[in-house]
Amino acid sequence: MKRRALVSVSNKEGIVPFAKALVEHEVEIVSTGGTKRALQEAGIPVTGISDVTGFPEILDGRVKTLHPNIHGGLLAMRERDEHLAQLNEHHIRPIDFVVVNLYPFQQTIAKPEATFADAIENIDIGGPSMLRAAAKNHQHVTVVVDPVDYETVLKELADQGNVATETKRRLAAKVFRHTAAYDAMIAEYLTDAVGEESPESLTVTFEKKQDLRYGENPHQKATFYQKPLGAKASIAHAKQLHGKELSYNNINDADAALSIVKEFKEPAAVAVKHMNPCGVGTGETIKEAFDKAYEADPVSIFGGIIALNREVDVETAKTLKEIFLEIIIAPSFSEEALDVLTSKKNLRLLTLPLNEENQAEKRITSIHGGALVQEEDTYGFEEAEIKIPTKREPTEAEWEALKLAWRVVKHVKSNAIVLADGQMTVGVGAGQMNRVGAAKIAIEQAGEKAAGSVMGSDAFFPMGDTVELAAKAGITAIIQPGGSIRDEESIENADKHGIAMVFTGVRHFKH
């Protein structure tokens, strides 16, 4: 008896030559709808699904393959006589190959004009049912969900007349990953649609983007995955124009740099090392912004990652070229700028759209045995409940500097202190176990620039000692959440030294 293949694909890439090759191996093709028409137009003999089921396609094609004549042929275990007897009794032929991919749900919901009804209509029912049935019975059925695997199947058929058991098992595992990811995407879409914030089970899916040379350290293996429908203004969806492959640490640092530069509407440049900003600058032009970021810390920027929120022009490119950098991220590069920067063969150049709204995504952090999920910290200065508890209010110039410090400090590892003037950071104290320690580092880094600068803190001052330290350094204004039981101590110290202090009511811990 001829072997039989059920072929029903939304992605028709390579299906005609694959089906032709199956026919050459004495395989009968059974097909549905558009796939059947495409194969017939190519001159391939095809049996219609209705001829197998004895039942027409109904409900606008919603019911085609959901039939015992199909699923019996897929699930029968060929080594069991009672299964074969039941197939014979009901005139059901075994199906040996299933070549199916699913309705384009992901592509549909990615379209801006897609409606909820469009999404629902592109939820495949029959396809996953056939794939899962075939994958469950992979000892007897070869199941193919990805056109990439056509060549492997045909090679094994040509070499040995059948598909190896190990290959069938690998293809079955791929099917279950595929259908799980498909269902996860649907679940995520519908969960978002009904506004469910903390569902009883979390279904997310990621697609492999690339293998990485290694992880955080050379002895650790690592892979880069991306969300199929993640924000376009993200490192996962960035376009690499030049340079060697991104490393695990590059990706983390680039993501951190991008998060900070998104805070600014004016021309801004951000330099990052080990996921902390070492310099942030703003200006009238992107060249001025980068010059300020460089001036903020000309030592730590060496080997760093730069993110800019305007096109890189040739003058900025010439300045960037003179510094050893790992990555430059920007919305675009002028042709002249590319000519300058691509002369450095290892420098990675990434582009992505930065004119999008700053889309908040859930942050998922894995822990041993589980995961933590939280909203992204997108709380802006405009939403803060500003209070000024000191006698002196900030001047206009201090307000600008305070806003810059506050935007940056929430992206610094806690405990965090940032010193800034109106256009740049001048000192960053990151990742310290106590706030005074972070302040000391920021002040030491700022040097003479500390005098006349302002201070931003990611959390409240537990005691008044940080204000005393700020006063000694010549810092004129402070922005912090407030809320300590000893706030009065900090306020009194600020008043004593003529420092203006702003409470935001918002903490920005980052771990």
Swiss-Prot record:
Q: Which GO terms describe its cellular component?
A: cytosol
EC number(s) per UniProt?
Answer: 2.1.2.3, 3.5.4.10
Coiled coil, from the record: none
Pathway the protein acts in: Purine metabolism; IMP biosynthesis via de novo pathway; 5-formamido-1-(5-phospho-D-ribosyl)imidazole-4-carboxamide from 5-amino-1-(5-phospho-D-ribosyl)imidazole-4-carboxamide (10-formyl THF route): step 1/1; Purine metabolism; IMP biosynthesis via de novo pathway; IMP from 5-formamido-1-(5-phospho-D-ribosyl)imidazole-4-carboxamide: step 1/1
Q: Where is the MGS-like domain?
A: 1-145
Tell me the InterPro entries matching this sequence: AICAR_Tfase_dup_dom_sf, Cytidine_deaminase-like, MGS-like_dom, MGS-like_dom_sf, PurH-like
Pfam families (alphabetical): AICARFT_IMPCHas, MGS
- What's the superkingdom here? Bacteria
Q: Which Gene3D superfamilies match?
A: 3.40.140.20, Methylglyoxal synthase-like domain
Return one Gene Ontology term, BP aspect: 'de novo' IMP biosynthetic process
Name the keywords, alphabetized: Hydrolase, Multifunctional enzyme, Purine biosynthesis, Transferase
Its recorded reaction(s) are:
(6R)-10-formyltetrahydrofolate + 5-amino-1-(5-phospho-beta-D-ribosyl)imidazole-4-carboxamide = 5-formamido-1-(5-phospho-D-ribosyl)imidazole-4-carboxamide + (6S)-5,6,7,8-tetrahydrofolate; IMP + H2O = 5-formamido-1-(5-phospho-D-ribosyl)imidazole-4-carboxamide
Under the GO molecular function aspect, what terms does this record hold? IMP cyclohydrolase activity; phosphoribosylaminoimidazolecarboxamide formyltransferase activity
Q: By its UniProt entry, which SUPFAM superfamilies does this protein fall under?
A: Cytidine deaminase-like (SSF53927), Methylglyoxal synthase-like (SSF52335)
Fill in the domain comment: The IMP cyclohydrolase activity resides in the N-terminal region.
PANTHER family recorded: BIFUNCTIONAL PURINE BIOSYNTHESIS PROTEIN ATIC, BIFUNCTIONAL PURINE BIOSYNTHESIS PROTEIN PURH
Write out the similarity annotation.
Answer: Belongs to the PurH family.
HAMAP family (alphabetical): PurH
**What name appears for this protein in its UniProt entry?**
Bifunctional purine biosynthesis protein PurH
